[in-house]
């Protein structure tokens, strides 16, 4: 397994619309394994392939259990996801491995139902709520070239741009 480089905002790569996966082979399995290792090493709970430079419609989510540990057997590998159903709305404070050090509330669907494939091309259906639903929406947005900062109000977006400018001027201040 290998640690992959996470691409940071404002890289144009993050705006790429990812392509559907048709080949479920050992290369894909290795990419998924490398993505999980990278996500865990970066202390994230989700990672879309485009965040490591792979324009493929796949993502992983590994929420920690109550003990705070992200168990490998809980890792969701979601390939070629499609929303089947969405319900309600909630505000949730989000962050992103591609936008380090910035957290802000974003409006999301409260519940989602998706259809996807696993690493073996088996079709699955998943119903999710709360943090899992938010993480799924956040990562699927990445597959469509959308970042959570795109969903901010004008005021919050200006705050983000200002913080980003400060961080770039003074990179050590926010680590």
From Swiss-Prot:
Positions of the catalytic residues: 139
Reaction catalysis annotation: N-terminal N-formyl-L-methionyl-[peptide] + H2O = N-terminal L-methionyl-[peptide] + formate
CDD domains named among the record's database cross-references: Pep_deformylase
Keyword field: Hydrolase, Iron, Metal-binding, Protein biosynthesis
Biological processes per GO annotation: co-translational protein modification; translation
InterPro entries for the chain: Peptide_deformylase (IPR023635), Peptide_deformylase_sf (IPR036821)
Positions of Fe cation binding: 96, 138, 142
Parts forming coiled coils: none
EC number: 3.5.1.88
Enzyme class at the top of the EC tree: hydrolase
Transmembrane parts of this sequence: none
GO-annotated molecular function: metal ion binding; peptide deformylase activity
Cofactor binding note of this UniProt entry: Binds 1 Fe(2+) ion.
Source organism superkingdom: Bacteria
Cofactor(s) demanded: Fe(2+)
One protein family per Pfam: Pep_deformylase
Keyword Iron: yes
NCBIfam families: pept_deformyl, PRK00150.1-3
Family: Belongs to the polypeptide deformylase family.
General function of this protein: Removes the formyl group from the N-terminal Met of newly synthesized proteins. Requires at least a dipeptide for an efficient rate of reaction. N-terminal L-methionine is a prerequisite for activity but the enzyme has broad specificity at other positions.
Protein name (database record): Peptide deformylase
Gene: def
């Amino acid at each position: 397994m290998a640690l992959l480089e996470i691409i940071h905002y404002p890289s144009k790569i993050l705006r790429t619309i990812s392509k559907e996966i048709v080949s479920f082979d050992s290369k894909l399995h290795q990419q998924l394994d490398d993505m999980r290792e990278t996500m865990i090493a970066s202390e994230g709970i989700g990672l879309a392939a485009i965040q490591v430079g792979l324009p493929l419609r796949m993502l992983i989510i590994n929420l920690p259990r109550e003990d705070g540990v992200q168990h490998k057997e809980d890792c969701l590998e979601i390939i070629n996801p499609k929303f089947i159903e969405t319900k309600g709305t909630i505000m949730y404070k989000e962050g992103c491995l591609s936008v380090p050090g910035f957290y802000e509330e974003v409006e999301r669907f409260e519940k989602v139902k998706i259809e996807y494939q696993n690493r073996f091309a088996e079709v699955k259906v998943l119903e999710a709520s709360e943090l899992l639903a938010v993480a799924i929406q956040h990562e699927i947005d990445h597959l469509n070239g959308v970042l959570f900062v795109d969903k901010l109000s004008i005021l919050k977006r200006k705050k983000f741009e200002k913080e980003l400018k400060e961080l770039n001027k003074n990179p050590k201040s926010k680590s």
